[in-house]
């Protein structure tokens, strides 16, 4: 009996231990994988993990990484609001200048630009890959700590003489490369559509068919979509050109310098007169540099504005050619329709004349005795008289229609 109790207690202790062993793992939450670990997941897993998307981060030192990040991570790195970040995920082109970042959406290129780095959405898109290659070319990798420090100070420290005068700020150069890639994309599409347009228009002038008309309609739809893209980006650039203050908001490096100067002034132990004199000298020197950079930015925007304006005019010219061809095709169709109507009227007039002759023949075919039946050789004269009557009726009707200008 005692051995039975001991074995039962041993089994209960083993069972309790097993229950504890089974419960311990359930109390531990699974570790959250890093952003880079989610890159290879499926679309459903990305949605379950809070909208993780593939982003490419490229900084001013030439360092580049590709990782899957959610919106909260991008907001934390770029200091933009969630409302502004939604602009990058929309299908409409938009350029937003904020305190610490620029949200750029050119449809094919979607990026968040800061004074230190640029984050590109849709890393596997061909246009984004082209932009990444251009960035690698313009910002070669600097692996050494001295080079990294020099590159950072070169863009952010004022220096009065060799600071910002030596080259454009990082964000300006990224904008320039992005506009260059976008203009190249639009230009290639315009060339392709122009080639298709001329071939389709030549075919239409030779032969009007349903297949050619379908191709023309598809081409016109593509031109309309491309024109809307170009027009939207052009309007965004024009907005910054018209508003100097908004253009100055694109200068993120200047804001960073001003913040650094403010912090240095608040933490300085220099006497107040010397500090004011030193600050005024730095401000006067930086104002000249900033004005030069703003002028450079204005010239940059004007250059791409004119380039987009030229592409827009080329697209509008192609649409005018298409509209002219459509008008020509409509004229041909109307001419053919008028010819068919003319032929139908002539046939109807002929039917009217023949019907009149048939009435005469039917009258003679009735079983009513008349004197003509006994007249010899009268049949031929009657037949030719009926034919002459039909011809006369046809000529008279056609002449009346032409007199009333119903027929040409």
Swiss-Prot record:
One of its GO terms (biological process) is pollen development. Keywords: Ion transport, Magnesium, Membrane, Mitochondrion, Transit peptide, Transmembrane, Transmembrane helix, Transport. Residues 1-10 have a biased composition (Polar residues). Residues 1-96 form a transit peptide. It is found in: Mitochondrion membrane. It comes from the Eukaryota. The chain crosses the membrane at residues 345-365, 378-398. InterPro entries: MRS2-like (IPR039204). Its main location: mitochondrion. Belongs to the CorA metal ion transporter (MIT) (TC 1.A.35.5) family. This is Magnesium transporter MRS2-6, mitochondrial. It comes from Arabidopsis thaliana (Mouse-ear cress).
């Amino acid at each position: 009996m005692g051995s039975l109790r001991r074995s039962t207690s041993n089994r209960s202790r083993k069972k309790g231990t097993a229950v504890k062993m089974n419960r311990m793992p359930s109390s531990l939450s699974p570790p959250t994988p890093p952003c880079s670990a989610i890159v290879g997941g499926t679309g459903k897993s990305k949605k379950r993990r809070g909208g993780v998307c593939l982003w490419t981060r490229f900084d001013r030192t030439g360092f580049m990484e590709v990782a899957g990040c959610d919106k909260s991570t991008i907001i934390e790195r770029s200091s933009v609001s969630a409302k502004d970040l939604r602009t990058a995920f929309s299908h409409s082109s938009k350029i937003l200048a904020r305190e610490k970042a620029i949200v750029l959406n050119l449809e094919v290129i979607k990026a968040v630009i800061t004074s230190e780095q640029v984050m590109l959405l849709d890393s596997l898109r061909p246009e984004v890959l082209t932009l990444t290659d251009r960035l690698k070319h313009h910002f070669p990798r600097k692996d050494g700590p001295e080079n990294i420090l020099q590159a950072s100070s070169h863009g952010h420290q004022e220096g009065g003489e060799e600071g910002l005068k030596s080259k454009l700020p990082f964000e300006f150069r990224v904008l320039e490369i992005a506009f260059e890639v976008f203009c190249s994309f639009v230009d290639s599409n315009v060339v392709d559509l122009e080639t298709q347009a001329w071939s389709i228009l030549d075919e239409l002038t030779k032969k009007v068919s349903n297949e050619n008309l379908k191709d023309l309609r598809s081409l016109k739809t593509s031109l309309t979509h491309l024109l809307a893209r170009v027009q939207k980006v052009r309007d965004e650039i024009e907005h910054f050109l018209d508003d100097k203050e908004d253009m100055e908001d694109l200068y993120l490096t200047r804001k960073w310098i001003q913040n650094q100067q403010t912090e240095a002034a608040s933490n300085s132990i220099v006497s107040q007169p010397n500090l004011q004199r030193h600050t005024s000298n730095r401000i006067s020197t930086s104002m000249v540099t900033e004005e030069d950079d703003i002028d450079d930015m204005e010239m940059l925007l004007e250059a791409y504005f004119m380039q987009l304006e030229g592409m827009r005019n080329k697209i509008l010219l192609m649409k005018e050619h298409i509209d002219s061809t459509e008008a020509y095709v409509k004229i041909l169709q109307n001419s053919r329709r008028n010819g068919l109507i003319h032929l139908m009227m002539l046939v109807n007039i002929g039917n009217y004349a023949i019907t009149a002759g048939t009435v005469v023949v039917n009258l003679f075919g009735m079983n009513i005795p008349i004197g003509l039946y006994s007249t010899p050789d009268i049949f031929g004269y009657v037949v030719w008289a009926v034919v002459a009557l039909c011809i006369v009726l046809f000529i008279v009707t056609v002449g009346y229609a032409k007199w009333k200008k119903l027929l040409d």
